[in-house]
Amino acid sequence: MRFGILRKGDATMRGWRWNWLIIELPILWLGNFSSSKVNAPTRDVFRNGGWAQKYIRSYGIRRFVIVWILLMGVIVSKPAISIGDSAPVDETTQKHLTLDEILVIGDAITEPMSTEVGTKKIEKGKNINIPDVLKFEPDIDLKRRTLIGDTTDSLAIRGVSGNRIMLNINGRPVNASGVVGGYYIDWSTIPLDNIEKIELIRGGSSVRYGNNALGGVVNVITKKPTAKPTLTFFGTYGGGDDIDSIQNYRLTHTYQIGPLGYSLAGSYQKADPFLWNNDFEGKNLAASINLDMPLDGLVTFGFQYANSQRGLIRENRLSDDPDNPGFYRRLNNDFPLAFGETFSPYSGTAFIPGPGANWDKTKYYLDFGYSQPIYDALLDLKLYKNLEDREEKNYSSSDINIGYADGALVLDRDVESDRSYGGNLELSKFFGNHELMIGVENKVLAYGDTKTNYIDMTYNSAPWVTPNDLSFKPSSEGVCWGYYVQDTWEISERWLLTGGLRFDSYKNKSINGSTLPELEDDALTPKLIGTYRITNTDTMTASIYQALRTPGLPETYWWAEGATQGDPVLKPEKNNAAELLYQHNFSQKDFVRVCAYYYNIEDYIMFRFDPSWRGVYNIDKAEIYGASLDGRATFTNWLSGNAAITWQKSKKEGDIYDEAGLSDEIDYFPEWKVSAGLEFKLPYQSVFNVTARYVDERQAIYAYSSGWPTQQHFKLIELDPYITADINLKVPVGKHAELSGYVENLFGEEYEEQFGYPMPGIIIGAALKLSL
């Protein structure tokens, strides 16, 4: 008999005093600080750097962390508290905790007030994209330049991002080729309009995921057809400090008609600029069709259209030199002091954004799937295709070229930035107490032409560039094959063991007459995961494995054409990893979990893009290790809470090109992170949530040029720690509607996730949801 992790029933606490906890939580501002060091009026405390920094500097990080450990202590000590009768215990299939689904976005139609373990409602606050929803997870780090419409690789799992993590929709990868200013993952193209749940898989212990999954996988599961037709509308409107409006509207419809089922969704997002010129508008359509076939087969078709128009950020500093007073002076006083960005690759001043500089990007995701049971086996086929095009336009700025007035067209370019495609075939079958899985995967990373329709060469001021240099066909293509086999063995009622092997090969080859050197390699990576059910409520999972990360197309190009000139050979990364996870379940909803991990990434790939040095190369290794403690508790029948604390470190070795030697750590990797939240169930089925997040100081190396003749400089910068707090009130209106109000960054904390790009202050808004 297959069995599951046994959990106690939900329990209700009686007669326990918890008021002291709320008074002592400075982040919630529900009581007074006990120290005279923080007794200034609220307005002064929150001004000029944020109250979080002042509190931490006065009290110290140690005491701040202790306060949050007390909240975790409440969760851990729950069994000693008088509780009511336990509910019946559910019995489910045993799973490894490492691969457990730790984040579920509940279907608001069926569970509008759900407080399930790890549940994060996409209807909460202004949430527009996946990073908004995942920011409270212990192993997630964010380094966004803007709050809305950021197209960079802004989300990291355990310190690794970009080409080291994988984003899937229903199991198919959506990572792009990453060339010509594109990014491996553009989170703005994955709206929340048709999402049923999100699975966050930490690390690379699964054989199913290949060369982009060294750090982990974010798997988006779309909504399924329903027996009865459903129609849901959700809309938010808000604004705040220096940002006039943020709009987000979503519409979803699902239905199953005989053998044909479908889900349809559409969304629209719009945000006024917070940073100079950085407005955003997004439009999305998605359709998923399921067709039941004979012999219990299932055919699926998927289509998604995403269009985003965004203004490129204009630099709002008089100087890039931190020692120059102009570094702290703005060109435009209507917008915050901030760095800008450029059209990529930078090829002169026509690629520096002027007034109205913008992208108009359209992306299509096309999918086909077929699943067929064969006796007690299951055959699963997935095929996919990505199509992404960008229209780029830039206009003259008198601040850049004094011979031009503002607003003349200086650059018009079309970029076919992604043409990737691939597929996967997998067979799984039970043999007694064993489940065998074998599969093959193919991915082709590709892009199309870049065509410069117009460039003003006089304005561009780059004599080394000709118009012919700016229009070109793709020079490379990446072909990846993966083969894997895995056996999951239920040894006994308490032991579960999974062993697997994965073989990956890749070739980044030159095409269209390119003289770029080619890269190819292969590797075999073993995986071993063991789970022991200690008691009906206590489970431990341990894993040791290797994971591969192959160089992407941009890395291959800059390895060959950058400062290293293709010597020595660029090697793939290999992560030698170990993880340990323990979880205790108090009930079906309440739990405490401890996780520790260690990564030793050999031949870690460095991508340096300094003003006078561009190149890609291997260093000897990067070590990343850390631990987290998180949990959830139901205190009474009207109050529940969750909390998490994370400690993490990193170390790089063997960087022969780091002549400055300023840091041996990964950039933007905070040592401590803490989050917590409380949920109050109010009369009339209303729900009030308060959540808070602390992020420790982060370091990064800032490279800039100054002087005459121009010299390159490196500076180790530190971003201050910060605390943000959010509140959300949801009130049902009749049977089919809900009204919500929210405040994000409640105390107007001034903070940055990436150096030189400030985040907005207080954002206030309202939401309406209709379900039919």
Segments (PLM) and residue ranges:
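N-terminal periplasmic "start-of-domain" segments of outer-membrane beta-barrel proteins
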Residues: H96-I130, S154
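Short acidic/polar hinge/loop motifs at secondary-structure boundaries
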Residues: P173-R202, Y328-R330
